[in-house]
């Protein structure tokens, strides 16, 4: 018997709660969640953040000034049924009628357990943030309680349609919004190219150690290159140690640590090139944000890349692991900085009319209202809350 863990529907519209399964640690899902919740509240749509404990040893974004955060003790990643029962009081305290669990078995398990209370009237919106087996397994397992599935790229939406053919009407695409320059950029051709990476400093998924190979390759080429590395993660010490031991005559590197999301716009605006080595993505937020500020993206051929980048016109796409091609593209751009300016302004134009905040927020609220008009979530009592 589950009691006292239901959510009272608010007056005046849906009340949404987003889960941060590993707290406010560095990552695109975190920055998207923090920014969207803030905008929703500014537009009088009630939103709360359920902030779980962070990964051990990871830096977190500062959130002392946030009134929309409720802290939940315990890491949701890999949480078992006992931990999930412990999360219930916090989830109940947000009094939401729409939940967005994001990427964790523990967060989906908690809302599934909540739904077993017959007095609860909740809906679940499942965001597929990455073209990854984990997401597809997660959403397939919890399909019984999900009202809407939102893919962040066409690749993801196509995959969802294949694995969930009975839910075609409940699958939609919503691409992240970004800030876009209102004017063209005029880079200083006399300065070295500034190449920026913004994201998790992690080998898993991000393949961040490819950065070392890129440095080595550029060190053997003509030109001068300045790198800015913004982020935190388990491979940060390895990267900094490598650069401390290895001197490059034409490659300089700044490690900026975890940069607040609101400062990233200026960082992209002061950079010439953005890079992404990822093994898989959904629709890289750093790629979109950098393009909006006129950075030329050089990224791997993952979900979202070909959807937003025309190779050679609004950026460059290389195969995963093909660092040599990435280095050659950077060297060629250094030798022809007029082309950097041309592609930079093409990037700004390509995202200007497709990633507005107001349009995104209106579409998101529309999805919430469609969910509220449908049936409430109810987990099958014969199915385990989390897989055995």
Describe these PLM feature segments:
Residues 146-183:
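Donor nucleotide-sugar binding/catalytic pocket of nucleotide-sugar-dependent glycosyltransferases
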Residues 296-299:
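Short hydrophobic beta-strand element within catalytic cores of glycosyltransferases
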Residues 258-259, 266-271:
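Short alpha-helical donor nucleotide-sugar binding micro-motif in glycosyltransferases
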Residues 187-206, 212-215, 228:
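Conserved donor-binding/catalytic core segment of Leloir-type glycosyltransferases
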Residues 101-108:
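Short His-centered aromatic/hydrophobic patch
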Residues 279:
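Aromatic "clamp/platform" in nucleotide-sugar-dependent glycosyltransferases that forms part
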Residues 240-259:
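Nucleotide-activated donor-binding/catalytic signature segment of Leloir-type glycosyltransferases, i.e.
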Residues 30-35, 202-217, 234-237, 324:
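A conserved mid-protein helix/loop that constitutes part of the nucleotide-sugar donor-binding site
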């Amino acid at each position: 018997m589950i009691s006292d863990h239901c959510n009272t529907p608010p007056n005046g519209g849906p009340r949404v709660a987003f889960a941060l399964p590993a707290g406010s640690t560095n990552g695109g899902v975190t920055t998207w969640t923090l920014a969207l919740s803030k905008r929703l509240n500014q537009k009088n749509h009630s939103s709360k953040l359920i902030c779980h404990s962070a990964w051990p040893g990871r830096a977190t974004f500062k959130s002392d000034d946030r009134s929309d955060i409720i802290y939940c003790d315990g890491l949701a990643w890999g949480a078992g049924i006992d931990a999930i029962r412990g999360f219930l009081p916090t989830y109940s305290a947000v009094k939401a009628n729409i939940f967005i669990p994001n990427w964790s078995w523990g967060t989906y398990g908690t809302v599934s357990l909540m739904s077993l209370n017959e007095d609860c009237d909740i809906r679940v919106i499942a965001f597929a943030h990455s073209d990854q087996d984990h997401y597809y397994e997660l959403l397939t397992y919890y399909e019984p309680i999900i009202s809407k599935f939102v893919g962040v790229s066409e690749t993801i939406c196509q995959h969802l349609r294949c694995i969930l053919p009975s839910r075609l009407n409940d699958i939609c695409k919503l691409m992240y919004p970004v800030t876009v320059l209102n004017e063209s950029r005029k880079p200083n051709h006399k300065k070295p190219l500034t190449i920026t990476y913004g994201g998790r400093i992690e080998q898993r998924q991000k393949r961040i150690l490819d950065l070392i190979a890129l440095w080595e390759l550029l060190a053997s080429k003509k030109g001068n290159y300045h790198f800015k590395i913004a982020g935190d993660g388990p491979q940060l010490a390895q990267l900094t140690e490598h650069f401390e031991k290895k001197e490059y005559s034409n490659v300089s590197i700044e490690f900026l640590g975890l940069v607040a999301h609101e400062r990233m716009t200026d960082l992209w605006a002061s950079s010439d090139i953005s890079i992404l080595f990822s093994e898989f993505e959904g629709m890289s937020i750093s790629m979109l944000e950098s393009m909006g500020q006129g950075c030329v993206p050089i990224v791997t051929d993952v979900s979202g890349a070909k959807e937003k980048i025309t190779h050679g016109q609004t950026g460059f796409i290389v195969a995963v692991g093909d660092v040599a091609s990435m280095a050659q593209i950077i060297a060629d751009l250094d030798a022809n900085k007029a082309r950097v300016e041309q592609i930079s302004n093409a990037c700004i134009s390509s995202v200007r009319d497709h990633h507005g905040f107001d349009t995104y927020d209106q579409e998101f609220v529309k999805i919430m209202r469609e969910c509220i008009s449908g049936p409430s979530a109810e987990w099958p009592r014969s199915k385990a809350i989390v897989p055995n």
